[in-house]
Amino acid sequence: MRIMWYMARYHQMRVSDATIYRILKRHGVNRLPGKPGRRKVHTKRYNKQVPGHHIQMDVKFLTFIGKKGEKVRRFQYTAIDDATRVRALKIYDKHTQANAIDFADHIIEKFPFRIREIRSDNGHEFQAKFHWHVEDLGIRHAYIKRGTPQLNGKVERSHRSDGQEFYQLLSYKGDVDLEAKLVEWERFYNFHRPHGAHNGKTPYEALREKL
């Protein structure tokens, strides 16, 4: 579906899903490499239609290979607006409450709307210091129930997109390069990448319609 939107948006070509699938299958690229398929679990979706009323926040764990063959661990903090799918991303070298607090301050400055609620899992980075920092800023902080990541499903799904469309194509050359490329990816995701939830519109196109 997304390829069809790209063709229409950027190349003015109308191609059906079936045609795209046949071409990909012919060339052996109709499936991305990765984990075998899993049975889909149907869960209730929660949608907030006002920008900023509900922000999902989570951390994506990253492992790269450094110049000397060593493992380099980094942490992508992610916030996604439920109503528009507008996202903010930032890389840290540690997985801490201090960095979660810094990221909360970052998205308050970055997002072009008032944030009313942040929803997170029960990870140690989102505990008391983070919780009360956010609450003191006038933002409600809610925890999802343990063992129910689907309640933060939008940020989880966006992390899969990061893996498939960004990190899978990335060659790690150091933190400065990584941070610069992540800024480019964030901008592409928000302003140029068609989104299924908005029938091919980008998150910022959806945002303009809701403001």
What are the residue ranges of the model-derived segments?
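Short small-residue beta-strand/loop micro-motif enriched in glycine and branched aliphatics
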Residues: 86-90, 142-144, 168
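An active-site-proximal beta-strand-loop segment
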Residues: 57-87
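C-terminal domain-tail junction helix/linker
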Residues: 128, 137, 161-211
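Buried hydrophobic side chains on well-structured beta-strands
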Residues: 3, 85, 118-119
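Basic, flexible linker segments flanking DNA-binding modules
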Residues: 1-63, 132, 148-149, 202-210
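Active-site beta-loop-alpha junctions of metal-dependent nucleic acid enzymes
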Residues: 72, 89-113, 117
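Acidic/histidine-rich, metal-coordinating catalytic segments
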Residues: 95, 113-127, 147, 199, ...
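RNase H-like polynucleotidyl transferase catalytic core
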Residues: 117-122, 136-154, 170-173
